[in-house]
Amino acid sequence: MISNAIARRYAKALVQLGAEEGAVDRFGVELGQFTALLDGNADLASVLKSPAYRIEAKREILRDVLAKLNLSGTVSNFLQVLLDRGRIGFTPQIAHSYAVFADELSGIVRPVLTSAFPLDDAQVEGMKSALAKATGKRVELSAQVDSALIGGVVTKIGDKVFDGSVRTQLNRIQDILQKG
């Protein structure tokens, strides 16, 4: 939980810098590029995270990597601060929190809609417009199928879940009957 708090703090700071520079989207892409590089190169990630290597050596490696990625000065400086403070290992969590804060700033909500059967385009658009009306934000809906729901839909927006599935309703009825 502490790592999430740390990640949110750094992500919020970078989003604020991005907003000041009008580069929120670009910073998100650049942070994602660096995170993908670390995810794809375990040796690089372990060197940058390891306390066994001198900070000067890690700074030089990071500078070389940043030069090859051609990131903006702000994101490069941000990543150097993370390295200096021993927080470079939090980059994936920071990138995730950054995306959440950037969406908030842009008025975007990204719900996940799970249904028992595939929805057609009209149904997806109907759900999108209903969610946009309810949230007052632009909706970028992700739809998936889970046949275990039996029927109905489950909508997850951030940490809130709206469960209108038949499976949940049957479970509730079963609980009521068992309690008698």
Curated annotation (Swiss-Prot):
Membrane topology: Peripheral membrane protein
One cellular component term from this protein's GO annotations in UniProt: plasma membrane
Pfam families found in the cross-reference section: OSCP
Alphabetized UniProt keyword annotations: ATP synthesis, Cell inner membrane, Cell membrane, CF(1), Hydrogen ion transport, Ion transport, Membrane, Transport
HAMAP family named among the record's database cross-references: ATP_synth_delta_bact
Name of the protein described by the UniProt record: ATP synthase subunit delta
UniProt key word Methyltransferase: no
Database matches in PANTHER family: ATP SYNTHASE DELTA CHAIN
Subunit structure: F-type ATPases have 2 components, F(1) - the catalytic core - and F(0) - the membrane proton channel. F(1) has five subunits: alpha(3), beta(3), gamma(1), delta(1), epsilon(1). F(0) has three main subunits: a(1), b(2) and c(10-14). The alpha and beta chains form an alternating ring which encloses part of the gamma chain. F(1) is attached to F(0) by a central stalk formed by the gamma and epsilon chains, while a peripheral stalk is formed by the delta and b chains.
NCBIfam families membership: ATP_synt_delta, PRK05758.2-2
Transmembrane portions of the chain: none
Job of this protein: F(1)F(0) ATP synthase produces ATP from ADP in the presence of a proton or sodium gradient. F-type ATPases consist of two structural domains, F(1) containing the extramembraneous catalytic core and F(0) containing the membrane proton channel, linked together by a central stalk and a peripheral stalk. During catalysis, ATP synthesis in the catalytic domain of F(1) is coupled via a rotary mechanism of the central stalk subunits to proton translocation. This protein is part of the stalk that links CF(0) to CF(1). It either transmits conformational changes from CF(0) to CF(1) or is implicated in proton conduction.
One GO process term, biological-process aspect: proton motive force-driven ATP synthesis
